[in-house]
């Protein structure tokens, strides 16, 4: 049962990401990629820098940092932002690569993951 709850929690996180991305697109459009691929990369790097900074303050123990940095500007908020920008980046790359089956195929697709 604990095993299933982990997957259900991740499914809920993914669904929450999709809903947040839809809402953000209504307000901001595609502003995340307005400055091209380099700008999109820098946005990802900036989000990771925030995660890295908080973990570094706790001897690189990201779990401990997650317990300390909570709330709207907390570690989980930065992790969620990074994950959402990564989803946007993946979607952009895959939609730009239509016809390239190697790029479009998801890892573990055959197993139903």
Predicted regions and their residues:
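Intrinsically disordered, low-complexity regulatory regions
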Residues: 1-113
């Amino acid at each position: 049962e604990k095993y299933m709850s982990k997957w259900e929690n991740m499914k809920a996180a993914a669904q929450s990401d999709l809903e947040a991305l839809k809402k953000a697109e209504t307000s901001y459009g595609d502003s995340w990629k307005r400055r091209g691929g380099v700008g999109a990369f820098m946005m990802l790097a900036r989000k990771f820098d925030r995660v890295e900074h908080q973990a570094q303050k706790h001897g690189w123990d990201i779990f401990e940092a997650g317990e300390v940095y909570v709330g709207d500007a907390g570690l989980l908020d930065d992790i969620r932002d990074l994950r959402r920008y990564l989803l946007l980046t993946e979607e952009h790359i895959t939609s730009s690569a239509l016809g390239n089956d190697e790029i479009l195929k998801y890892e573990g697709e055959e197993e139903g993951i």
